[in-house]
Amino acid sequence: MKSLSDRTQNIAASLTVAIDTMAKQMIADGKDVVSLGAGEPDFGTPAPIQNAAIEAIRAGKTRYTAPVGILDVRKAVAKKLEEENGLHYDASQIIMTSGAKHAVFNALAALINPGDDVIIPAPYWVTYPELVKWLGGTPVFVEAGIEKNFKIDADDLRKACTPRTKAILLNNPCNPTGAVYSKSELEALAKEIVAQDIYCISDEVYEYFVYDTEFTSAAVFPGMAERTIVINGFSKSHCMTGWRIGYDAAPAPIAKIIGKIQGQATHHPSNVAQYAALGALNMDKSNVHAMQAAFRKRRAYMLERTSFLKTKPRAPEGAFYLFAPVSDYYGKKTPDGKVIAGSIDFCSALLESKGLAIVPGAAFGDDTCVRFSYAASDENLAKACDRFEAFVKELQ
């Protein structure tokens, strides 16, 4: 047999997916496991969205659409971006995708040539570097640890840029850290992006989950609209993770290329999911406000329950994750003698001994921390925190 694709075989599997799958299998096997691994809201898809999908099915709207998506849906996305974000797009610049992850792939595929560098602030979402490598690019990590509030600045970006730099991949609000760039911080970054003449892929999927500041899109600043691809979707904001629907909003020449890519790949996202997204765009924000309130309360609870750590976690400004520093406990042993050498050992021992699944920071490029998702019920958060505290206090 001839060999398989080297490029594809070199892609690392998603550690967040692997941990979530492991936890679900343990639960299926009858084990007592609490999982705070997956970034998935624990609320149901709102009724208006369900009804929009049902009505589309009953009306026979189940055939092929244009590769870039249904025109009415793209018009509604453009309207949302205008009214909520101050961004000006024609419907032809919107490409509906099978989730925001697919939108990130489209953006990178449109931009990257072999040997191009893509700057990725670290910690980062696990998928970013793997997609860059898959497409022949080189991920260049710019460290932004807890001492920098998990954010890079214009000087960091300037130092990282070389003639090979094609783009920066910015996640704001950030998974896994919950960091949110203020308008002034983002404006300073935008000026440097323009000065360096690079592209910006701005993943804004957590835009509605901001606690302490106003959300600002990277594309709003002077010189940015023509070089920014905005990524967004409905999985987090409208509890539609399984529907797989998102979008790229791009400058016209890039949008045209993305349309070609999609036409030869998936053709288009699910017809029914697009109509469900239209229902989401047309409904009020009451569900979003309810989730914001719930996540704000859970954030406070998680900060209180993890305050015993030697290094206290930084309060997340957005999203629904707590990125907790645990490196103070590396080198210690579990009661059965296992040495905790890093975040992977920490999380493995925690799952094995206490039945709590969280994600090691190593998956996100920061081995000093672990990630909790607080998109879970109050009961499960309490159980998780009890188990986490017991585990840490048993380390010797």
Language-model segments: what does each one mean?
Residues 64-97:
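Conserved N-terminal alpha-helix of the aminotransferase class I/II PLP-enzyme fold
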Residues 4, 8-14, 19-22, 26-32, ...:
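PLP-dependent class I/II
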